[in-house]
Each structure stands twice: as C-alpha cells, then as structure tokens.
Regions:
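Cytosolic catalytic domains that perform sulfur/thiol-centered chemistry
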Residues: 1-229
C-alpha cells in the first residue's frame, strides 16, 4: 500500500507511502531504493502487488503505476498493479484491515535497467514518438516540439485503467513499431499512460518535462556564452 495516511489496507499489506521513494520530485538513488525496500522485507525475487493513491493529487492510480515503474527499473520483474483501490476491494466483499503487515528485513539487490526511462539525448534524437500526458491546457501552453497529447485522464475511468479495446483506440494515433516516450512535469502522472502502453506491448519509456527544460536552459546558456565570446 503506497497511499499516504491510509487507514484501511488489504490484509497483510506492507505500507510504504510513495513519497518515501522520492526526494522532493526526484526518485531516490538505486542504493537508497534498495535499502528502503529491503528494510520493508521485500527482495527482488518476491511477488509484489502495488496499490494505493494520492488523495491530495486528486486520487487515481498514478502513484501505484509510478512505484511499479520504479520496481521494474530496479530489475523487479514479478510485480503487478492492483486494478482498483482498497475501496473497490472492500466493495467486492473482500476483507480489509487497519493493521499494516510487518516482514523481517531482506536484501534487495537491484539490477538497474535503463530500458524504462528516457534521457534528454534520446528524446531529442527523433528515435521515439513523444507523448505529452499532461492536460490539454498544459499542452497548449508549451510542450516538447513534435509531441502528441494523450492526457493521462483519458486512459483511466475513476480509479481504474480503461479496458484494453478502449486503450487500443486511444493509442491508435501511435505507431506500434516505433518506441514511445511519455512525459508529464515530473513523470508521476505520465506513469499511468506508460503503464497502459506497456500492458499493450509498446516499447515505452518515462520522462519528465522538468528534465527537458533543465537541459534546454543549459544549452541556451552555453549558446549565449559562446555568442558573447
């Protein structure tokens, strides 16, 4: 359960609020993440199901899909995202608990993969289709040149991912044979679209608009210095 301040859990759930995986908006280092997961009793060989939401962010599965992305990036293959929230679990007549699960510490040995995230050079290379998963309004204000707008809200209904046939229609504007880079400001909400693309078999990577602008500003500053010499 990666929700913050959650009081009801699926019985036996380990509680690690998703904010513990971050330092402000930046993801912790692989070693820091391995220590966090190991202390919680998770090894890379364990089967993991992630669920939860961020109510201050408006709810929805973005934090869960983001933690799923982090785990996959660390080489954890046996991980899934619960379809729905603990409320959906309870509504189905299944039990909940107010107690968090506690497991003995284990060694989480990361096997970091670069196949799940994009670098600025890759975004600029033209190799991938660029998907802006922010709102239509944000996209209209500014975006990465050439990006296609697929708002993250379009792939979910309430707290759940839309069905496969609907997702296929939404992603119909993309070339399935070409890689995809998905971004939002920090990448958190983009992870929902990235997750949906991965489920459908796309070669997708996650990116952040923050990183794009940091690199753009650096290049502009270098160009300005060169022109003044």
């Amino acid at each position: 359960d990666i929700s913050e301040n959650s009081t009801e859990h699926i019985p036996g759930s380990i509680v690690i609020p998703y904010t513990q995986f971050l330092n402000d908006t930046a993801v912790l280092s692989a070693d820091e993440l391995a220590a966090l997961l190991g202390e919680a009793g998770i090894s890379r060989e364990d089967a993991v199901i992630v669920y939860g939401e961020c109510m201050p962010c408006g709810g929805g599965p973005a934090p869960a899909t983001f933690i799923y992305w982090i785990l996959r990036s660390l080489g954890h293959d046996n991980v899934k995202v619960l379809d729905g929230m603990v409320e959906d679990w309870a509504a189905a007549g299944l039990p909940t608990s107010t107690d968090a699960g506690i497991l003995p510490a284990k060694a989480f040995v990361p096997r970091v993969s670069s196949n799940f995230s994009a670098e600025y050079s890759y975004v600029e290379s033209g190799q991938a289709q660029i998907v802006d998963a922010r709102s239509i309004g944000e996209f209209a204000t500014s975006s990465i040149p050439g990006a296609i707008n697929i708002p993250y809200e379009s792939v979910i209904s309430g707290n759940r991912l839309r069905d496969e046939s609907r997702l296929e229609r939404i992603f119909g504007i993309l070339d399935r044979e070409q890689p995809v880079v998905v971004f939002t400001n920090t990448g958190l909400k983009a992870s929902v679209v990235w997750y949906a693309l991965e489920l459908l078999g796309y070669d997708a990577r996650l990116y952040s608009y923050e990183n794009y602008w940091i690199n753009q500003q650096t290049l502009n500053q270098e160009a300005s210095l060169n022109s003044s010499e």
